[in-house]
Amino acid sequence: MTTLAIDIGGTKLAAALIDKNLRISQRRELPTPASKTPDALREALKALVEPLRAEARQVAIASTGIIQEGMLLALNPHNLGGLLHFPLVQTLETIAGLPTLAVNDAQAAAWAEYHALPDDIRDMVFITVSTGVGGGVVCDGKLLTGKGGLAGHLGHTLADPHGPVCGCGRVGCVEAIASGRGMAAAARDDLAGCDAKTLFIRAGEGHQQAQHLVSQSAQVIARMIADVKAITDCQCVVIGGSVGLAEGYLEQVRAFLMQEPAPYHVALSAARYRHDAGLLGAALLAQGDTL
């Protein structure tokens, strides 16, 4: 059965047809609408899926935010440009005329990455470091989503009680410091206004402040991983996202994690499916690979 998989992120929308063997075809991308109003998102999704829907039998959505009974909510509304209570499943069922499933993008990515691991791995955590910081938890071979869809939102654990205010309302969240948005917000002087991609470029050129911002992000993520290990006793952690997959970043996270006491050490690896993990995980779930 062919699935039309959609990934809704803070900066881009992606869609592709995925068959039962997880082969991807006809991948398309559009920028996430700048206005992020309900009408703008609805029109962008329509333009994205219209060329693909005739060949699909169902729709699977991986989206940033919290999914509750088909509604798209946000723990940090800034990641969705203030968009709240968007009827995601209903909208796609209307556009595509197909049965539709929706799940958080990091939870979906965790499910895809779990299936790429050896069979003896039953407990793993996926962490995405991108516009925000998110995650997904697989425990004893089951994906944890939680009653309200909140499970795995690791970016909203505490990093610094004196840190910046997070979009979720807490002070000092991991996401407020370590995410691409958090790094950019902390940039000063000649780096003011730079996005995370530019900060990595400048860090590679030897810019001291840029190197500090990247290093600070990696250290915060490493400390969060130590917390995650203590809570879940996971066998491995997989890192994805545009920041998480940036050159040299995982190595820094690993080095900082090794500075933590030995009980908190855990194997780290880069996401095998990279930027397609959300699409593939959502397709797996829609094809009956249940929670």
Swiss-Prot record:
Pfam families, per database record: ROK (PF00480)
Enzyme class: transferase
Keywords, in A-Z order: ATP-binding, Carbohydrate metabolism, Kinase, Metal-binding, Nucleotide-binding, Transferase, Zinc
EC nos: 2.7.1.60
Residues the entry annotates as binding Zn(2+): 156, 166, 168, 173
Highest taxon of the lineage: Bacteria
Pathway: Amino-sugar metabolism; N-acetylneuraminate degradation; D-fructose 6-phosphate from N-acetylneuraminate: step 2/5
Family: Belongs to the ROK (NagC/XylR) family. NanK subfamily.
Listed name of the protein: N-acetylmannosamine kinase
Source organism of this protein record: Salmonella schwarzengrund (strain CVM19633)
Name of the gene this protein is made from: nanK
